[in-house]
Amino acid sequence: MSEMFDVNAAVYPFPPKPVPLDDAQKAFYREKIKILLKQRNAVMVAHYYTDPEIQALAEETGGCVADSLEMARFGSNHPASTLLVAGVRFMGETAKILSPEKRVLMPTLNAECSLDLGCPEEEFNAFCDSHPDRTVVVYANTSAAVKARADWVVTSSIAVELIEHLDSLGEKIIWAPDRHLGSYVQKQTGADMLCWQGACIVHDEFKTQALMRMKALYPNAAILVHPESPQAVVSLADAVGSTSQLIQAAKTLPNSQLIVATDRGIFYKMQQACPDKELFEAPTAGEGATCRSCAHCPWMAMNGLKAIADGLEHGGVLHEIHVDAALRQKALIPLNRMLDFAAELRVQVKGNA
C-alpha cells in the first residue's frame, strides 16, 4: 500500500459553531420547518451524525435517518418534489445524482467533509492518470466530480466484498479517499491497493491507549468501531462496521455496556435500537481538552433548526444543490455499478460514513 502525500498537512479550518437556541426558539423553528415542508412538498432526510433533535424531527415529519446512500435512495423513492438533506455537501450531491428531477436543498452548502476536501478533483485525476492500469474505487464520501472519475463507488458495508471480487479478477486497485478504511479492506482481502491518504477528522482522533483505559474502567463492555478509524483502534474492536452495521451490532451483542468509536450523533438511533443498554463515547486523542472534533463532525453540527428553516424558506444559491448533467451521468455509472453488484449478491447496501 503506497502513500500519496503528507497527511499531517491536511488540516482544515472548522466552521463556527451554531448559535445555541433556547427552548422557545427551538419550538418556533420546529413548527416553522413542519409548515415549510408541507408548503414546499418536501421531505427531510438526515444523516446518523446530525444532532439528535434534527434526527427526531426528520422522523417526526415522515422523513428518514440513515447513511448518505440510503438518504439519497429514500429521497428518490419518496413522492416529494423537494428533498431537504441534513448532512454534508457530498450527501446533497448524491441525492441530486439519484434524483435529478427533484429540487435538493441543504441547510448550508458550506458543510464540508474532510474526506471530500482531502481528495480534490484535479489532484486525484492526475494520480489516476499516472496509474492507468488500475481500477479506480472511491468511497461514497467524495464529490460528484471524483465519483465521475471512478470505475466503482463503494460504501463501507460492501467494500470488502467488492474488493474481493475485483481481486479475484486480477485487477489492481486505486482506493480513495480514506486511508484507514483502505488499510482495513486491504488487510481483509490481500488485494493490490494503491491508497489515497485521506482521513475522517472524527475517526482519525480515536487512539488505542485512551480506548484501553476506558475498557479497563468497563471491562464487560463491547467495543464498536467504524473502519474509518486507525487500524490499531480497529484491532481492539468486538465489532467493526458501517453506521448501520454498528447499530445492528449494538442490538445483537450480549453486552449491556457498549463503547462506541464513531461520531456521537449515532447514539440517537443506537439507543433507540437497544434502549436497555448503556452507551459510552470512545475517547478521542485529546480526551476533551485538546481534541479537535471531540467525536462530533463540526460540519454536521451546522445542520441546526434555524439553518434548516432558512434552507426551506429561501433556497437559492446558498442552499440548493446543482450537479452538471454530464457530470451526473458519469457519476451515476460507478454508483449504479455498485448497486447492481450488491443486488447480485443480494446484499442491502447501507452504511457509508
Swiss-Prot record:
It comes from the Bacteria. Pfam families: NadA. Iminosuccinate binds at H47, S68, Y139, A140, N141, S156, H226, P227, E228, T243. GO terms for biological process: 'de novo' NAD biosynthetic process from L-aspartate. Binds 1 [4Fe-4S] cluster per subunit. GO terms for molecular function: 4 iron, 4 sulfur cluster binding; metal ion binding; quinolinate synthetase A activity. Pathway: Cofactor biosynthesis; NAD(+) biosynthesis; quinolinate from iminoaspartate: step 1/1. Gene3D superfamilies: NadA-like. Its main location: cytoplasm. Keywords: 4Fe-4S, Cytoplasm, Iron, Iron-sulfur, Metal-binding, Pyridine nucleotide biosynthesis, Transferase. GO terms for cellular component: cytosol. [4Fe-4S] cluster binds at C113, C200, C297. The keyword Kinase does not apply. It is found in: Cytoplasm. It catalyses: iminosuccinate + dihydroxyacetone phosphate = quinolinate + phosphate + 2 H2O + H(+). Its cofactor is [4Fe-4S] cluster. Its EC number is 2.5.1.72. Catalyzes the condensation of iminoaspartate with dihydroxyacetone phosphate to form quinolinate. Belongs to the quinolinate synthase family. Type 1 subfamily. This is Quinolinate synthase. It comes from Serratia proteamaculans (strain 568).
